[in-house]
Swiss-Prot record:
Cellular component, GO annotation: plasma membrane
Residues with a covalently attached lipid (S-palmitoyl cysteine): C315
TM annotation in the entry: 38-63, 73-93, 119-140, 164-183, 192-211, 241-266, 280-300
Domain of life: Eukaryota
Gene that encodes the chain: MC1R
The protein's name in its UniProt record: Melanocyte-stimulating hormone receptor
Positions in the Extracellular compartment: 1-37, 94-118, 184-191, 267-279
Keyword Lipoprotein belongs to the record: yes
Length: 317
């Protein structure tokens, strides 16, 4: 990804010296002040990407295999898995090419590396945007299924879901291409930050509303069965904990990356901001961690999908 404060990884590898052993420690910024820099080992970066790649390939394969999973909800989950797969795969490819260039095992002209870097950047950026969009689409789908349960199948149809998916992919590719072309414009970075905040607010509002409705429903049942008041309280706490984990993971994994973009606009030369810029690879690693967690939250909790996945794994042996 083209970001201020850190050179492009592939192009920098052409003339780079062997890097020091990755570490967690204090590094000096431009003003001589000390700041915390977390270096992500390439082996860890590749390992996280591989785990995410395998997980999301399994999700896509299971949904494609089982016709019972060909519904709008699983369509969005499948596309989320595909987006996460591309996020992990593109970052793995960039890391692998960088290591080969640094080791001298791969010879390439600067122009070729520039083009490859641009392609990887577009894939990475578009898959990030689409991943955020599909997280929002899943939240909207679940909201409609709860608040418009009787009309759900007439509102959320498979053709409409497919059109939404196509629109998300096209918009993601176009926006990412513009971002790569005009990454040095503050307006572009601010648009990305606003988009992330919009997705965060959308998910928070929808899931909090769904939790409130579920608690009201449980409270109504508890009134009919007075003995179940403790169970109702436990349900509310469990729902709040689940919501906190879901939104917390989303913010923890995606927030640092968009904070990075925000600081590029607000304080590109400030010493403190420069310290944060040094941890860009850590922020990418957190996004890959989110790609690992997404299948656990949205896919593997489905009994039907787990059963299909088991069949796929048994057949592969």
């Amino acid at each position: 990804m083209p970001v201020q404060g850190s050179q492009r990884r592939l192009l920098g590898s052409l003339n780079s010296t062997p890097t020091a052993t990755p570490h967690l420690g204090l590094a000096a910024n431009q003003t001589g002040a000390r700041c915390l820099e977390v270096s992500v080992p390439d082996g860890l970066f590749l390992s996280l990407g591989l785990v995410s790649l395998v997980e999301n390939v399994l999700v896509v394969t299971a949904i494609a295999k089982n016709r019972n999973l060909h519904s709008p909800m699983y369509c969005f989950i499948c596309c989320l898995a595909l987006s996460d797969l591309l996020v992990s795969g593109s970052n793995m490819l960039e890391t692998a090419v960088t290591l080969l260039l640094e080791a001298g095992a791969l010879a390439a002209r600067a122009a070729v590396v520039q083009q490859l870097d641009n392609v990887i950047d577009v894939i990475t950026c578009s898959s990030m945007l689409s991943s955020l969009c599909f997280l929002g689409a899943i939240a909207v789908d679940r909201y409609i299924s709860i608040f418009y349960a009787l009309r759900y199948h007439s509102i959320v149809t498979l053709p409409r879901a497919r059109r939404a998916v196509a629109a998300i992919w096209v918009a993601s590719v176009l926006c990412s291409t513009l971002f790569i072309a005009y990454y040095d414009h503050a307006a572009v970075l601010l648009c990305l930050v606003v988009f992330f905040l919009a997705m965060l607010v959308l998910m928070a509002v929808l899931y909090v509303h769904m939790l409130a409705r579920a608690c009201q429903h449980a409270q109504g049942i508890a009134r009919l069965h007075k003995r179940q008041r403790l169970a109702h309280q436990g349900f509310g706490l469990k729902g709040a904990a689940t919501l906190t984990i879901l939104l917390g993971i989303f913010f923890l994994c995606w927030g640092p990356f968009f904070l990075h973009l925000t600081l590029i606009v607000l304080c590109p030369q400030h010493p403190t901001c420069s310290c944060i810029f040094k941890n860009f690879n850590l922020f990418l690693a957190l996004i890959i961690c989110n790609a690992i967690i997404d299948p656990l939250i949205y896919a593997f909790r489905s009994q039907e999908l787990r059963r299909t996945l088991k069949e796929v794994l048994l057949c592969s042996w």
